[in-house]
């Protein structure tokens, strides 16, 4: 009814411009949502990769880079695994440290990981080399960022000295081999984090007790001298020997004519897990009763109680949007002496910045909808003005205003729908191509990512489409009401 030769000459270009305007606006909205959501997911994924969604730590542990020791509990470990939405649980320990090279020093956070560590994130950002094997006997290996390597002029397979800083007066040194270089683009993290086996953090932090047995290789006056020493803990050691009469660290005097085994259990006043050192004296000649005849000494330890301590548990969940719910569930499952740190608690400035990006998207959406409304209002008014004679004729024949208004609203809906359809084809099409082929590059030094990130948010796309249609049609009610002001007599007479 609204199509005629007149429309082809006058209205058609206006309608086409309105359709193109709506299509461009919708395409920009789709791209804005896809890019911002993609960027947020990329950055969130990298931050989570450095420290998981949650860290379960001691109540004495503030949000920082220096873990407070925590006695590992298999029960807590298994309970965390059973919680809904939890996909992975791993232990960790971190400590401030210093990497030294010939070119200078670099302060770092040394993160120790165990065999249960989820390597997916770190493997995805390793640019040179490869991680160490979990079953490798040699663990003196370290992964650093390319940023740190460039600053200190280090390269793959170089040996570096790392100092573990326990307090102002205690820095313990250990040499490592660089086995991999990673790069994320997040300078605050790349300039800090290095990764190694958790055993080094446990040992050099002095979290547990390491007991050693000392046995004299020379027999004097028919007796063999033995003693014990220990490291770690609080330094105030107490010794419990296999022989009740032996006290302290020694020396203990052993008179024996046959093979003998003995041990010492070492504890401290702070209640640190004890460690035990063992020794065995084996005589070569069993036929003799001379206590000073040739013998062999074998000593061993239980490995040190530091292996029983961790910095905490890291918990990964299947959906970042469930962070609050999962936090409540995790906290309720923990004993009184543990607490949780969400990833948003550990890096609030990054997540505040990411949240502000949503404001940019809202501004773009509002502007595009306003432009669409202006385009449609102009187009609808021109169509109505062109159709004054038709409107007057319909009114003269007895038609009321409502059916005529509906006709123009239906026509508006058709134009808006066509614009939204083309906007979806263009916007989602470009987003899908970028998601698949990554053909638009970025400078990672400025944007943290090497290509424009895309997240295809189908639910948001549908909401945007419905919202745009609803707002535009609602806005068309005002210009469509102009129909009610058209007089049948004047419009017919005018034409």
Please give the residue ranges for each predicted region.
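Membrane-interface junction motifs in transport/secretion proteins
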Residues: 40-74
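Solvent-exposed segments in extracellular or luminal domains encompassing
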Residues: 250-265, 269
